[in-house]
Amino acid sequence: MENSLINTIKEDCQYWEKLNGNGFYHYMHLQECEGSKQNGLYQLILNGKELWYGTLAEINAVVKTMIMRIERDFTL
């Protein structure tokens, strides 16, 4: 289950980058921290800086919301 969520987040990060110009100006990725597998905490990195630190479920929600906002703004 954890690997599936990690893959989903990575794919969603790539999709977010595509929506923002293929990562030319903006890039986002999931980063494992020391002990991530043991404590369940990861980092979401946006343009080289930590955007969010938390569980995979929290990070997934953040990424999904960011995608939803961009898609909504493009349709306005």
Where in the sequence are the language-model features?
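Short non-domain terminal segments
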Residues: 22-23, 51, 72
